[in-house]
């Protein structure tokens, strides 16, 4: 618990907040649920309204739209989360109980589906989130069984953790997970942030000061996103420290679903668009 103590202190410190100005708005979505940014500068956006994944360049131009409703490879039924590593894109297809993997041009590679398999330990249903470690291991947030499953990059089951037998670290209201640069697994679970190591051992459980919709990462920058608030953190070794940012020129009715902190910029996803903010010079 001690290594993450600073997190709670800074979440409540308004004196440390930073000011960001709105500089751009791009994308037009029906019900965007998640987005990720590649090292090449492309955004990948999951849209539940159209059951599609959009690839958008840094200027906001749509490069490709892919998917559509269905249950075959390359089709989706509630694409709830999109994540990536250096080479591939991973789409969490909630109502199809699967994780689909694509290359950076959205060409289909593979599909992970275990719900009707013989191994109940490996089975997941209605997945909410997926992320990949630096070693290529895939972590799936299983909402049906309220646990996390770990697979290798080829889909071989490795272990499960965070279930009912995890004691204080049992997941109860899972929302999303990320794998940090130092391979800790952070799970947004209701009003708590639960931290596991790569072997599934519980490290910390932190009570959050408000309800958040998402936790996201861009390299070592981590964000917590609420309806109208965003907190930004950088992780150094085993220390997390979040600060709240002030976002100017945003309509009070705007609801954020996800966010990314990239250098001196913040990208905030809503159901219908992406806002781009830049850090104000003081």
Residue spans of the language-model regions?
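Eukaryotic scaffold repeat domains enriched in small/polar residues
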Residues: 18-282
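Sec-dependent N-terminal signal peptides
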Residues: 3-13
């Amino acid at each position: 618990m001690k290594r993450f103590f600073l997190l709670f202190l800074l979440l409540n410190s308004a004196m440390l907040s930073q000011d960001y100005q709105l500089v751009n708005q791009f994308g037009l979505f029906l019900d965007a649920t998640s987005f990720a940014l590649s090292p090449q500068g492309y955004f990948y956006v999951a849209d539940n309204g159209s059951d599609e994944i959009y690839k958008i360049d840094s200027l906001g131009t749509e490069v490709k739209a892919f998917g559509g409703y269905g249950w075959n490879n390359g089709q989706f039924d509630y694409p709830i989360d999109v994540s990536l590593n250096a080479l591939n894109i991973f789409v969490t297809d909630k109502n199809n109980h699967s994780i689909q993997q694509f290359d950076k041009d959205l060409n289909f590679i593979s599909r992970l589906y275990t719900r009707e398999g013989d191994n109940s330990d490996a089975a997941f249903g209605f997945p909410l989130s997926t992320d990949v470690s630096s070693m290529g291991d895939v972590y799936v947030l299983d909402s049906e069984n309220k646990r996390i499953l770990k697979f290798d990059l080829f889909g071989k089951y490795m272990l499960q953790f965070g279930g009912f037998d995890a004691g204080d670290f049992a997941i109860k209201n899972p929302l999303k997970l990320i794998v940090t640069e130092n391979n800790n697994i952070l799970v947004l679970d209701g009003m708590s942030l639960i931290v596991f190591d790569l072997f599934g051992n519980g490290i910390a459980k932190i009570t959050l000061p408000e309800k958040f919709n998402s936790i996201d990462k861009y390299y070592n920058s981590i964000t917590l996103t609420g309806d109208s608030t965003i907190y930004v953190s950088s992780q150094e070794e085993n220390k997390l420290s979040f600060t709240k940012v002030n976002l100017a020129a945003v309509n009070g009715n705007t609801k954020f679903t996800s966010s990314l902190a990239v250098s001196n910029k913040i990208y905030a996803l809503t159901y219908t668009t992406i806002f781009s903010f830049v850090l104000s010079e003081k």
